[in-house]
């Protein structure tokens, strides 16, 4: 047999660079493969039936067909270390697949020997059609040098194998006949499992081979290769393969069929790969009409775009217009120059900057199936949902958690994809039923059909995979996208459950939402994935936008139904680790004595807690503060990247999502300054120029309205601050966008910087009301509110109202838990059986003792600046019962500190505002009511604030006088009494009080040491009598004593007593204006 000197390029690539032999691998293997293929058998003409004169072509296997097939399998293993896959190319050239298909069809029903031959042939078919992961192959050979491998020819060969396999239904029918006897056995041994697995893998391989991409006018082979997947699905349905898949999936929890759940998962993923649930739910009879309507709409949109360009210079009527400037003369050869802006036309002639094309990924390779195939999949999908989805997914998740060897990393992606597909498909079916027959027909498809993936254990595993993919270096983008899409559909499922008419669904949705939102990591992930988008695929961009839109919408809806929310937030372990390292380093430097190693206890290290393990703390949560976190430049860049593709949006939904997220930033977070950039304004101009091609939907109108609002704000700000035009060229850091165009605070103060240092040394300005006005608390609050509101700092008041609402909700929860209500219906009794006095609107002492101090923690830079250096806002905080800790002194530190460290500590204490624990809920509620009333009807100031307020004198810090040389005894190190400074009367009184207290304490200790039982009994009887008298007095006269044990003083009439800046809570409540 003569071989060609140079094989065709498709089958004979250039030999690998690492082979130095005179004959390459092709010349070595091809003769052997061709010889073995010829020995397999051949076709002959057979008269059937005999003496009929009718002949048909029948394949006759050779006498040694079984041995030849085994030799071919040995040759196939030669490709294990060959990147070029030379043996596979030789087998394609020798047309081995044609022989193997004929052997399977001919020998499958020829008894035991025929089954054995057919199984070996099926093994080779599975090897030849095994999916080729081109990306993974290229990644593996990347480090081996300049290896050039022609994978396109291998993929083309597999496509021809698939076409050969689907010419008739006999090959698939023969493979099914090999599996059925093994499936029918009640107890399957290892051989039966291998036969079933082999048949399923052959079907999986055929489904994995992608169709060729052909134009609408393609004919012949191109048109045939573009519809192979539809033909395969049709044959699988006619040969009951789909029913077999349903059986295996529904029995995946059985011991004998559980080994096949992973391969069934792979098959189902390949069946539904590239199919949109929205297309599957449509009436397939109307699909051609809808497709034609979409094409006409696309053509109309393109014509509308072209009409704006107008005629060119090659049109029938030429037009030439000259544009003259001060030093230039420009000639325009366009008819549109008559009516269009010349500057705009000149911009069109500029060289366009090349835009990097966004790539698509594996999850978005859509297929175009025939109507018959889609009808089959509609029935199969509905049956899969009703029969086996929960059972099948549960078995897969159980195997994943148990880390069985059959589970591969790619199986996670398949679970996510199928789950998101079937959840979306179920929701679309329910929506369709709701439109047709109302809510009664929804019982036909309950939401519990996909309940398994919505279980909390499944959601936790899903989020764990999302975090792992996010933390990987490099990130696993495909699996991350599948996680996000599945998470989005689970959220939509929970949202549908919350609005269901079934009370059980509503209750489950409430529990799931509480557990989801309690974990702050889930909420933070929505912000992270949107913020960290760079240059990933288009489908990934669409997924993260959809995820953020759904999560924010549902979280806002849920938060409106709750008076307060709490979240479990991870602590900053990185900061703790730094502090721990610094402390250990300092201790090491000071350490004078070290313990020898032989005396060390190794067991202590083993049982020591893991200091690097993440720790969590519970925090109050408000949706407004979380929503403001989306007002970042990185998030804006992601939204604008998505918005740039507005002409490619498939329907109004993508536009609705991006406009909704932009609305949250601009309107609700008041972050329109983030869009004051030149690149953003260019995008807005493109949209406004092409708004006539936008779909006629409410989302398009909302987009135009939002853009107009941003532009109006921008130009209004430019008119006020021209420097905004310069700021529009730079990025907007956090906190900077609210002060775009504002002047710097570091201007020259004409004192060589001394004024700034003096202000820093003096600390923040403290204000107080002038005493002669004698304002009530409500009047003081209205004045402070009017000043802050007039300065445009209304967002600070909204923020402090949110903080007070959090504190109020926390304290009310303690009161309800402890007292069972603020006003009890029955008198309670204490431990001694005595009836307690009713507290009309006041919590019990036990509830008050459980109150904790609330530390004010500003998050944004504006809030930090306000609590630190805004005197009017600090005055309002004092009126709201907030307080500051006393400034630290040198004696407060155990070790000597430098002046810089002391100044830093004092600076921190000036902004460490806290709400004391003894502030009652009623006072907080009254403060909130007053602020909300002022927000609805802002008060106005008739007088100048300078006439109402004045600067509060800061208390001078007294220093301890150092002892003089004469008063110091060098021998004893003490100060001589005779040389001590003379004490004033106030110091004498303080010293006497201390001595008296010490004497009483000593007397008390001596009395307690007395062990006379009679004296002890008289003491307790006397105490019991006094307690009864106090209870009777309290019941008759209310509460004559204040909380601190001081009798309330009457106001003086001599004008010397002024209204305090922060009156007691009990006094404030009577002065409030509601």
From Swiss-Prot:
Keywords: Cell cycle, DNA damage, DNA repair, DNA replication inhibitor, Meiosis, Nucleus. Residues 1014-1031 have a biased composition (Basic and acidic residues). The lineage of its organism: Eukaryota, Fungi, Dikarya, Basidiomycota, Agaricomycotina. It holds the Pfam family TIMELESS. GO terms for molecular function: DNA binding. InterPro entries: Timeless, Timeless_N. It comes from the Eukaryota. Belongs to the timeless family. GO terms for biological process: DNA repair; DNA replication checkpoint signaling; meiotic cell cycle; replication fork arrest. This is Topoisomerase 1-associated factor 1. Residues 572-595, 936-1074 are annotated as: Disordered. It is found in: Nucleus.
């Amino acid at each position: 047999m003569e071989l060609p000197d140079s094989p065709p390029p498709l089958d004979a690539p250039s030999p690998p660079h690492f082979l130095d032999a005179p004959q390459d691998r092709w010349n070595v293997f091809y003769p052997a493969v061709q010889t073995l293929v010829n020995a397999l058998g051949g076709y002959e003409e057979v008269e059937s039936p005999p003496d009929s004169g009718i002949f048909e072509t029948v394949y006759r296997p050779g006498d040694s067909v079984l041995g030849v097939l085994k030799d071919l399998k040995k040759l196939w293993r030669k490709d294990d270390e060959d990147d070029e896959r030379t043996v596979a190319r030789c087998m394609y050239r020798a047309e081995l697949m044609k022989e193997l298909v004929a052997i399977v069809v001919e020998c499958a029903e020829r008894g035991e020997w025929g089954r054995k031959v057919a199984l070996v042939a099926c093994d080779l078919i599975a090897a030849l059609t095994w999916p080729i992961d081109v990306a993974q192959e290229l990644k593996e050979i990347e480090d081996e040098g300049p290896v050039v491998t022609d994978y396109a020819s291998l993929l083309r060969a597999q496509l021809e194998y698939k076409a050969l396999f689907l010419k008739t239904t006999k090959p698939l029918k023969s493979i099914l006949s090999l599996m059925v006897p093994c499936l029918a056995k009640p107890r399957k041994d290892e051989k039966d499992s291998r036969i079933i697995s082999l048949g399923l893998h052959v079907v999986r391989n055929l489904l994995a081979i992608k169709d060729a991409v052909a134009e609408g006018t393609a004919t012949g082979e191109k048109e045939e290769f573009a519809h192979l997947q539809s033909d395969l699905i049709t044959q699988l349905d006619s040969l009951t393969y789909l029913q077999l898949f349903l059986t295996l999936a529904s029995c995946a929890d059985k011991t004998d069929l559980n080994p096949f759940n992973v391969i069934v998962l792979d098959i189902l993923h390949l069946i539904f790969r590239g199919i949109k649930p929205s297309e599957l739910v449509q009436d397939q009879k109307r699909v051609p009409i809808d497709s034609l309507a979409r094409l006409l709409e696309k053509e109309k949109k393109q014509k509308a775009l072209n009409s704006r360009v107008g005629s060119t210079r090659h049109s029938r009527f030429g037009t030439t217009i000259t544009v003259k400037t001060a030093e230039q003369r420009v000639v325009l050869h366009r008819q549109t120059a008559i009516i269009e802006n010349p500057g705009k036309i000149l911009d069109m002639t500029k060289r366009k900057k090349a835009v990097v094309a966004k790539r698509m990924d594996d999850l978005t390779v859509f297929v175009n199936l025939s109507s018959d195939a889609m009808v089959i999949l509609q029935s199969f999908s509905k049956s899969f949902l009703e029969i086996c989805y929960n059972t099948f997914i549960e078995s897969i998740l159980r195997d994943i958690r148990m880390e069985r060897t059959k589970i591969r990393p790619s199986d996670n992606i398949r679970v996510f994809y199928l789950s998101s597909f079937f959840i979306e498909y179920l929701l679309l079916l329910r929506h369709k039923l709701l439109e047709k027959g109302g809510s009664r027909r929804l019982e036909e498809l309950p939401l519990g059909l996909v309940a398994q993936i919505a279980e909390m254990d499944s959601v936790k595993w899903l989020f764990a995979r999302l975090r792992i993919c996010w933390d990987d270096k490099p990130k696993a983008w495909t699996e991350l996208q599948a996680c996000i899409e599945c998470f989005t559909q689970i959220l939509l499922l929970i949202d549908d459950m919350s609005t269901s008419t079934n009370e059980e669904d509503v209750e489950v949705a409430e529990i799931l939402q509480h557990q989801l939102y309690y974990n702050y990591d889930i909420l933070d992930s929505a912000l992270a994935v949107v913020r960290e988008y760079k240059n990933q695929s288009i489908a990934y961009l669409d997924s993260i936008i959809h995820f953020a839109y759904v999560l924010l919408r549902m979280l806002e809806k849920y938060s409106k139904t709750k008076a307060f929310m709490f979240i479990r937030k991870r602590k900053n372990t990185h900061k703790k680790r730094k502090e721990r390292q610094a402390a250990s380093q300092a201790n090491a430097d000071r350490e004078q004595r070290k313990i020898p190693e032989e005396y060390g206890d190794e067991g202590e290290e083993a049982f020591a807690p893991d200091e690097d393990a993440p720790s969590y703390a519970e925090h109050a949560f408000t949706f407004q503060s979380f929503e403001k976190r989306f007002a970042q430049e990185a998030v804006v860049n992601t939204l604008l990247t998505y918005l740039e593709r507005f002409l490619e949006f498939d329907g109004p939904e993508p536009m609705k999502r991006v406009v909704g997220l932009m609305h949250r930033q601009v309107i609700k977070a008041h972050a329109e300054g983030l869009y004051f950039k030149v690149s953003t304004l260019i995008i807005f101009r493109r949209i406004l120029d092409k708004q006539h091609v936008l779909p006629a939907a409410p989302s398009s109108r909302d987009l135009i309205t939002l853009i107009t609002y941003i532009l109006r704000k921008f130009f209004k700000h430019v008119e006020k601050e021209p420097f905004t035009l310069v700021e529009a060229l730079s990025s907007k850091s956090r906190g900077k966008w609210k002060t775009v165009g504002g002047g710097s605070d570091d201007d020259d103060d004409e004192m060589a910087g001394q004024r700034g240092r003096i202000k820093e040394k003096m600390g923040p300005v403290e204000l107080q009301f002038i005493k002669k006005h004698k304002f009530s608390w409500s009047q003081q609050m209205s004045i402070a509110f009017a000043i802050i509101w007039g300065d445009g700092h209304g967002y600070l008041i909204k923020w402090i109202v949110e903080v007070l609402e959090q504190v109020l909700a926390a304290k009310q929860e303690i009161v309800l838990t402890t007292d069972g209500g603020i006003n009890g219906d029955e008198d309670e009794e204490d431990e001694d059986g005595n009836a307690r006095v009713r507290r009309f609107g006041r919590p019990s002492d036990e509830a008050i003792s459980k109150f904790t101090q609330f530390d004010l923690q500003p998050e944004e830079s504006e809030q930090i600046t306000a609590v630190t250096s805004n005197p009017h806002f600090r005055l309002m905080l004092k009126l709201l019962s907030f307080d500051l800790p006393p400034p630290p002194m040198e004696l407060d530190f155990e070790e000597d500190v430098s002046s810089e460290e002391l100044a830093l500590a004092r600076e921190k204490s000036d902004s460490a505002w806290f709400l004391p624990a003894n502030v009652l809920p009623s006072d907080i509620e009254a403060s909130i009511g007053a602020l909300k009333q002022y927000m609805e009807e802002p008060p106005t100031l008739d007088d100048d604030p300078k006439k109402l307020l004045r600067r509060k004198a800061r208390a001078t810090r007294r220093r301890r006088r150092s002892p003089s040389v004469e008063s110091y005894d060098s021998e004893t190190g003490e100060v001589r009494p005779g040389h001590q400074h003379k004490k004033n009367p106030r110091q004498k009184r303080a010293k006497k009080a201390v001595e008296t207290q010490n004497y009483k304490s000593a007397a008390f200790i001596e009395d307690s040491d007395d062990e006379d039982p009679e004296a002890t009994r008289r003491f307790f009887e006397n105490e019991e009598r006094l307690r009864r008298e106090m209870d009777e007095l309290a019941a008759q006269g209310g509460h004559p004593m204040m909380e601190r044990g001081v009798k309330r003083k009457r106001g003086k009439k001599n004008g010397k007593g002024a209204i305090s800046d922060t009156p007691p809570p009990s006094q404030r409540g009577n002065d409030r204006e509601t």
